[in-house]
Structures are given as C-alpha cells and as structure tokens.
Amino acid sequence: MRKIALKVAYIGTNYHGFQRQPDVPTVEGKLLEALEGAGIIEDPKRARFQIAGRTDRGVHALGNFVSFFTEEDIHVNQINDLLPRDIRVLAWASVMYPFKVRYPLERHYRYILHREESMDTYSMAEAAAHFRGTHDFSNFSRRSDRDPVRRINDVRISEVGDSIIIDVYGESFLWQMVRKMVRALLMVSEGELAPDDMAGLLDTDRRVFLEPMPPENLILMDLKYGVKIKLRHDEYAFKRFISLLEEEFKVYREMSMVRRAMSDHLRDLQEHELD
C-alpha cells in the first residue's frame, strides 16, 4: 500500500467550492469520481483520502493537493480522461506515510485586480506591511471562527500590464480572509482608509464589517511542504490545461469587446439623440 499525493489545478467557476457537498458539483466530488472510475480507490474513507485546501465557490487553483492510499499504479492521463476539462491532475508523487497533506508550511494565494488610473499601489503596499507577522484576523473572518490568529509571511503587490497582482503567503487562512484583506487594501487605495488604519483592524475587539472581494479573481497558486516531494509532472496535462485557459481567455476577451461596443453605442445615443 502506497501513499500518493496529487497536485490538482482547476477553474472554480462551475463548482461550489473544492470540498464535497451533497447535490452540488464540487472539485473534490469530481476528483473522487475519477479516482473511483479509474479503479485507483474504492472508498474515500478506506483510502484515507484527504485534501489540503478547501477553496470557496468560484475560487481557482494551480497547486492544490490531495493524498490517499492505494495499491494501484498511478497514470495521470487515465485520471484526467475521467475528469471535466476544467479540472486537471498536473503531477503526482509517492510520499512517506508521515506526510500530512492538510498541513503545508505555506500557502500562496494570488488576487488579481484590473488596474485603474486612480489606484494607489504605494499606499496599498504600505498598508499590506501591517499584515505581516502573527495577528488576530477576526475582522477578516467570520465571527464564529474559534481561533482567528494567523501568521502571514508576506504580502507582495505588483503591477503587470493592466493588472494589479496581490500575492499573499501564509501557513493557513480563515474563510474569506484573503478576499477581505484585498477589500481593505482597495479601500486604502480609494482613500476610504489610511495605510496606518490597517493596524487598527488587527488584534482588536472592535468589530468592523468588510465585504469580501469576488471569488472569481482569487487563485490558490501553490502549497509548500516541509518535506521534499518528488513530483512527477505530466507534460500532456499541462498542455491540455494551458490550451483550455487560452480558449477561455479568448472567449472572455471577445465577450468584453462586445459589451464595450454596446456600452459605447448607448453612450453615443445618449449624447446625440436623447436631448
């Protein structure tokens, strides 16, 4: 019996999060169907199937992990053939029994914003510095979370083309925590908060409501573990997933162009014919 780890990528748009839920499609549910269909596992409990990251509905991933025990050989293409196109196993590894997929040393999330001229990335970076270290993130989570203390290793903000990239690194995260952190940074950029106000939202009993940013812009980029994992990457899986992403990018770009044309036309009508 071997312990196996799979590195999984997915587009979260069509799923109600990663974790299994009754009567709705989830990434974990589709993955288990494929593993059972391929004869790799028969029962998740007997296989001691575990997941690393429970991403929310609409959140995407390029490096989530699962682990399980099996006596069967692993053929990535066999698993991927039974998965929807928007879920891919990118790599696998045989790991030691003590390996615990649920406890990575670091999780890397990336949130992508469309850059507006009014956005002040310098103030955002100044505010983001307050997140580093160990803090009580109660204002960035649900009130029902029993232990809101988390450690953030780093927050990096960069501009790439028309995008602002916010990379957040930490051991673990609360529900909606990253999306609420980004909301606070955006409020700083828009002048609703000062950079130093961020300190007042941390380690405090004063409760402030922060609307989480949309999940569709969030990606779980990767997980790092304390033990070295010899991942066997599948080149064909990479090519197929890249191809799908490029197809979807083209579709969304064309949809954006159509909406822009409609908006421009209505503005023209408003200016010249609705006097």
UniProtKB/Swiss-Prot annotation:
The catalytic activity, as recorded, is: uridine(38/39/40) in tRNA = pseudouridine(38/39/40) in tRNA
Q: Entry's SUPFAM superfamilies?
A: Pseudouridine synthase (SSF55120)
An annotated Gene Ontology molecular function: tRNA pseudouridine(38-40) synthase activity
* Positions of the catalytic residues: D56 (nucleophile)
Q: What EC number(s) does this enzyme carry?
A: 5.4.99.12
Binding-site positions, substrate? Y109
Q: Does the keyword Kinase apply?
A: no
Q: Which keywords accompany this UniProt record?
A: Isomerase, tRNA processing
Q: Which Gene3D superfamilies match?
A: Pseudouridine synthase I, catalytic domain, C-terminal subdomain, Pseudouridine synthase I, catalytic domain, N-terminal subdomain
One short Pfam name that applies is PseudoU_synth_1
Domain of life assignment: Archaea
Tell whether Isomerase is among the UniProt keywords. yes
Q: Name one GO biological process term.
A: tRNA pseudouridine synthesis
Which family, according to UniProt? Belongs to the tRNA pseudouridine synthase TruA family.
The function of this protein is: Formation of pseudouridine at positions 38, 39 and 40 in the anticodon stem and loop of transfer RNAs.
What is this protein identified as? tRNA pseudouridine synthase A
Encoding gene (name): truA
